[in-house]
Amino acid sequence: MSHNLKQLFQQHKVKGLSINSKTVKDKDVFFAIKGRNTDGNAFIKDALSKGAVLVITDNKKNIVIDKVIYVKDVQAALHEAIEIFYPKKPKNLIAVTGTNGKSSVVSYIAQTHSLLGKKAASIGTIGVEIFGCDNLINDVPELTTLDYLSFRKIAHNLAENGIEYLVFEASSHGLDQARLREIKVNIACFTSFSQDHLDYHHTKENYLLAKLKLFINHLLPNGIAILNSDIEEIEFVKDYLHNHNIKFITVGKKGDLEITRINCSLKGQNINFTFNNREYNFNTPIIGSFQASNLLIAVLSMHYTGFAFDDVIDSLVEVKAVKGRMERIDNTNIFVDYAHTPDALEKALTELKNIKLHDSKLSVVFGCGGNRDKAKRSLMGQMAAKRADTIIITDDNPRNEDPKLIRAEIISGIEKADYTEIANREEAIKYGINNLKQDDILLVAGKGHENYQIIGDKKLPFDDAEVVRKCVKVCHPVA
């Protein structure tokens, strides 16, 4: 590096780093990086106007601007700067990938650490959750896997405040775009795999290989991969990891940790499993048999981090469901779930169908996001038609697409089943609640924890759970 960055930063009394001109603060250094969709060089003047004390670029055309410094490799300069400003990380790092279940597993692992007396945090779709001390983090970018700078900023802050264990989601996009760079983890988990994000990856094979980069590129040599044995492609995954000399263990109905029986009800479930030739049993208030494997993936991650197995099992009764993940709203038979893939929707509906009373009905309200994988829309309609008695199609973050066309693509998969189409999501939820009878169950799917609705380029306040609560007060459904 031709410039001594540490000396430069001291000279200009630099306070922070940024790669986004929108987030630049006074005395920051702005790194003008050319990305997939935007070029940071186009925002140099914007960054300077917001108080950037220096700009670093690999585009020579911009060095005529005052305070702009040229380097041959801006990414390498950013990496060096990160090591200067944000060198610390929690000692124990655990990463979780999978189509569905990532948010649940990272939360379960972090919660369990806290229940066993350790300071832990999780990063992912829901944001940053901190257990065992006050919440320290604000202004987290809305990405499942953060950009490398944001990740290191947060990790440094957590380490500075005594967090020992950090669990984070690793999305296929983040892995494919190498957002984690050289981050290495002690444990890497694979929760599930089914169709999603084909608008980005194009093929299911590319999507799977992107997921597997977590294990190949980021797992420490002495680390372990924890896999859901019920993944359809599990044999391919096992062979792939074996060929790369990666140690792994499986969880599931055919796993090394074998789930033998699950009894579910509206109040939770009782789970039986065997591990190392011993039988175990535990209760959890968390609903959904698919959560059994998520909870037990969390158990094994704790076990291989050095915690006593029996202590971990004993703590599970206190682990809470994640917001928007099969979340039962107050004392009603109405559930909010993030299910936004065909597989997740089918699993959520199957669970609720299995625990409802014989003569009661199961209804679902859902839509599909705009500017996202179009191929899954008809499949989600198909899954709803297979599992639900009443289907209400509505809007779910249509973004810049015509919402009517999105709904039509969903409806094309419903075929002969009856459905109701209500564009306005609040009205759709209200309609679903109004039509509930004694012991009926309603699933509001697709948004989960989200507290917004994206229409065009506008992000409007909208929270499924809060809308349900509001409608319940008006409609007084029978719980």
From Swiss-Prot:
Keyword terms: ATP-binding, Cell cycle, Cell division, Cell shape, Cell wall biogenesis/degradation, Cytoplasm, Ligase, Magnesium, Nucleotide-binding, Peptidoglycan synthesis
Top enzyme category: ligase
Pathway in which this enzyme or protein is active: Cell wall biogenesis; peptidoglycan biosynthesis
Stored Gene3D superfamilies: Mur ligase, C-terminal domain, Mur-like, catalytic domain, MurE/MurF, N-terminal domain
Positions of post-translational N6-carboxylysine modification: K211
This enzyme's EC code(s): 6.3.2.13
Entry PTM: Carboxylation is probably crucial for Mg(2+) binding and, consequently, for the gamma-phosphate positioning of ATP.
Record carries keyword Lipid metabolism: no
GO biological process: cell division; cell wall organization; peptidoglycan biosynthetic process; regulation of cell shape
Annotated positions binding meso-2,6-diaminopimelate: R372, D396, N397, P398, R399, G446, E450
Keyword Ligase: yes
Motif (Meso-diaminopimelate recognition motif): 396-399
Compartments, record wording: Cytoplasm
Residues annotated to bind ATP: G98, T99, N100, G101, K102, S103, S104
Listed GO CC annotations: cytoplasm
Function: Catalyzes the addition of meso-diaminopimelic acid to the nucleotide precursor UDP-N-acetylmuramoyl-L-alanyl-D-glutamate (UMAG) in the biosynthesis of bacterial cell-wall peptidoglycan.
Similarity-based family: Belongs to the MurCDEF family. MurE subfamily.
Protein name, as recorded: UDP-N-acetylmuramoyl-L-alanyl-D-glutamate--2,6-diaminopimelate ligase
Organism: Rickettsia montanensis
